[in-house]
């Protein structure tokens, strides 16, 4: 789900068919809003899709995205990204996190939620030397009914009328209350809780949420 704070969103999410056994899931947030952010995000989408074809290393894809976008990103802008490659046969996820909010892993067997927090640098800050060294692949396996939740900071930093943030505790509470309903249930519950929390207060940031569930 994507709920833009303005008519033009600075968040980006995508589903990419890599080959018959693999697909890619991307989520990103560009610093800044409006048309400039959307232009950078359109470039990001184009480069990501061109590099994803046939590539099973999420880190390699983001390293190429950074290399191609770095010359065009202003000094006051950057892109936080997470890119996950799903192997349909082995239920393995290869994840790379480029300065993005840590994805959440829900384990159905024991009803626990942990942050998946591998190191990584946001796109557009470094030309490649440091970025390529610190931005690496991280692998995890999903079991039946496990969920991987990707989100932008518009979720945790949503503000109520008093200026208080929604926060990670409320995110986790919403997930635990709805995980038995699957990916759609988590998205519905979390979106409803966010709207109830924010109320009539103007939304100050884009909100994007992706839930991947292993059947």
PLM regions with names:
Residues 1-149, 201-215:
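… and, occasionally, acidic/histidine-rich disordered N-termini of signaling adaptors
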Residues 62, 82, 138-150, 155-215:
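C-terminal catalytic subdomain
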């Amino acid at each position: 789900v994507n709920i833009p704070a303005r008519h033009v969103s600075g968040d980006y999410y995508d589903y990419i068919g890599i080959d018959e056994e693999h697909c890619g899931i991307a989520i990103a947030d560009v610093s800044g809003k409006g048309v400039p952010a959307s232009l950078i995000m359109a470039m990001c989408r184009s480069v990501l899709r061109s590099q994803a074809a046939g590539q099973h290393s999420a880190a390699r894809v983001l390293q190429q995205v950074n290399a191609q976008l770095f010359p065009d990103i202003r000094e006051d802008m950057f892109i936080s990204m997470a890119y996950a490659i799903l192997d349909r046969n082995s239920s393995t996820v290869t994840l790379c996190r480029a300065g993005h909010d840590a994805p959440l892993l829900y384990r159905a067997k024991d009803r626990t939620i942990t942050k998946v927090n591998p190191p990584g640098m946001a796109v557009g800050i470094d030309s490649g030397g440091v970025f390529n060294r610190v931005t690496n692949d991280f692998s995890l396996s999903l079991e039946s009914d496990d969920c991987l939740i990707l989100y932008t900071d518009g979720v945790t930093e949503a503000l109520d009328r008093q200026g208080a943030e929604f926060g990670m505790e409320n995110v986790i509470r919403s997930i635990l209350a709805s995980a038995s309903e699957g990916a759609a249930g988590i998205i519905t519950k979390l979106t409803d809780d966010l709207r109830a929390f924010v109320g009539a207060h103007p939304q100050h940031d884009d909100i994007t949420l992706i839930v991947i569930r292993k059947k």
